[in-house]
Structure formats: structure tokens, C-alpha cells
Amino acid sequence: MVVILDTISANPVRPRHPEKANRPDALSPPKPDWIRVRAPNTRGYANTRRIVKENGLVTVCEEAGCPNIGECWDKKHATFMIMGDTCTRACAFCNVKTGMPGAIESSEPEYVAEATRKLGLAHVVVTSVDRDDLDDGGAEHFAQTIRAIRERCPATTIEILTPDFLRKDGALEKVVAAKPDVFNHNLETVPSRYLTVRPGARYFHSIRLLQRVKEIDPAIFTKSGIMVGLGEERHEVLQVMDDLRSADVDFLTIGQYLQPTRKHHAVIRYVTPEEFSSYETVAYTKGFLMVSASPLTRSSHHAGEDFAKLQAARATLSR
């Protein structure tokens, strides 16, 4: 493991995998005026942070450097990241550290459930690092976490954001059997950018994963998201929409890629709010129940409100 100085994010020193540490600096253009967020300094933010730390939990909000952390934590909305803070992959866009993860904390599902109760969450989002080192990719741990939340907070709806469980036979079935309300798996980018942006993954495996969820349990909402500004073309984004609809995915998110450090993939360009609005309009015409497309859209941003909209959209279709 190599430690390099992180000169962009608020956390100045983070362990970096040699694959990232040895990359030349990649410079991005200055951020435009439409990408601005408030500093996280409210009382609600502080209270959420305290509960997270008291329960010894990791959040993707912190580890991935999410720009919406101030807004979400002020409302007591946090996305819990299970199975540690170290990922077995080194995706070029991601700020989560890479290395050999430690053993899974067997009590973590209970800690997540208790934090969900303390925060009074009506809708909780749980994600994880990639755990290619585990036989099932962490699928059973996901299932245990879902069951623990159900037991302690029966009224809380549960959304999960999973890795791809690549080459982990039977893993997906374990997670789906636990019956989350929303199953999210992000494609992250268009197929042509996978080699440089997400080299450890396979685009059509991810499409098939989402399709398989619906085949096993059609009642579960499925969701996926991509980042733009990584060098993709508009027609490629539209093709991703078609691929997701062919897999019967309900909810699409599209957000601007923001470079975590100079050792990460550069921002090729900043997509304008008008372009995001156009993507949203087109996506709805293709049949998605819910679409969120804006510069600061992230997978878990407004997840609770969006879940209510998903339910309403499905109810309208079934009339």
C-alpha cells in the first residue's frame, strides 16, 4: 500500500493503491458555477456524524467524498457502507481506498440496524465495497444486514447498492431472497469507457445482474446510475438507457463525474444543466418509472423521497 497526499478532497491523506498512486496527475477544468454545495457545518450534520461514529460504521458519503453530504446528513440521511472501508478494486473514478480488506465484522448488521433506529430513518440505503476476496462477494452479509434492519425497524424501507458479484455463483440469489425494497447496481459509465474507468467490471454482466433481479422477484424495484463527463458521447448514454430498459430497470440516475484527486480520472467536460434536463426527458419517454438527472445527482441522494415517487408511479401504471 502506498500513501500519497490527496490535494483535492477535505481529507488530506488517504491510502492509495499503487495503481492510482503511480498515475501521473490528471488535471480537470475548473468547476462551473452550477456545481456549488454548502460546507457541512449544521447541527443536524453533527448529530448524524456522532451516531455513525458511536456505532463504528462506515458511510459511502464520507469515503467517496459525496458533494451532498452536508445536505443529507443535516436531514439524518446517511448511506451505510458495510464490509469495511477497503475495496478489492481500483476503479479510476472512485475515492474509496483499495487494498486487502480485513475480516468482516460479524456484528455489523446489528450496528447498522441500531443506527437506522437511532436516526429514525423511514428509508435506509446500504452499500458496500467490492469484496472479491470472499467466496460469495459478501452476499450473505448483505442479506444479514437486510434481515437485521427488518427485525429492528420493521416500518423502514430498505434500498441496497451492491457490487456486481462477478464470478460469484449464487450470490445474487442470496441478496434477492432477503427482499430489499430497492436493488441498485450502478453501471457507472458507458461501455466504451469501461477499460479506463471501471476495468475490473463487465458492462453486460452488470446489465444481466439487474435483469436477473427482476426475473427472481418482479416486486423489487431496480435502479442503476451512470456518471457523465468522462468522455462519453450522447448517443452512448441513450444506448445505456435502452440496455437498462431491456433489463426492466425502473429507476435511472445520471450525475456529473467529479474528480476526487489528481490521481483519479480527469473530468473531460462538465455537462450543462440543460443537457441533464434533456437526458431526463428522453429517459422518461423510454419508460423508466423514475429518473433523476442533474449535476449533483448521486445514487442515494433523496432516496427516501424518490422511493415514494417510485411507489406512486407503479400504482398509477397498475390502475
Swiss-Prot record:
EC number assigned by the record: 2.8.1.8
* Ranges for region Disordered: 5-31
Q: Which reaction does it catalyse?
A: [[Fe-S] cluster scaffold protein carrying a second [4Fe-4S](2+) cluster] + N(6)-octanoyl-L-lysyl-[protein] + 2 oxidized [2Fe-2S]-[ferredoxin] + 2 S-adenosyl-L-methionine + 4 H(+) = [[Fe-S] cluster scaffold protein] + N(6)-[(R)-dihydrolipoyl]-L-lysyl-[protein] + 4 Fe(3+) + 2 hydrogen sulfide + 2 5'-deoxyadenosine + 2 L-methionine + 2 reduced [2Fe-2S]-[ferredoxin]
Q: Name one GO cellular component term.
A: cytoplasm
Gene Ontology MF term list: 4 iron, 4 sulfur cluster binding; lipoate synthase activity; metal ion binding
Q: How is the cofactor bound?
A: Binds 2 [4Fe-4S] clusters per subunit. One cluster is coordinated with 3 cysteines and an exchangeable S-adenosyl-L-methionine.
- Which residues are recorded as binding [4Fe-4S] cluster 2? 87, 91, 94
What sequence ranges are listed for the domain Radical SAM core? 73-289
Q: Which family does it belong to?
A: Belongs to the radical SAM superfamily. Lipoyl synthase family.
Protein name, UniProt field: Lipoyl synthase
Q: Which lineage is the organism of this entry classified under, starting from the top rank?
A: Bacteria, Pseudomonadati, Pseudomonadota, Alphaproteobacteria, Hyphomicrobiales
The gene name on file is lipA
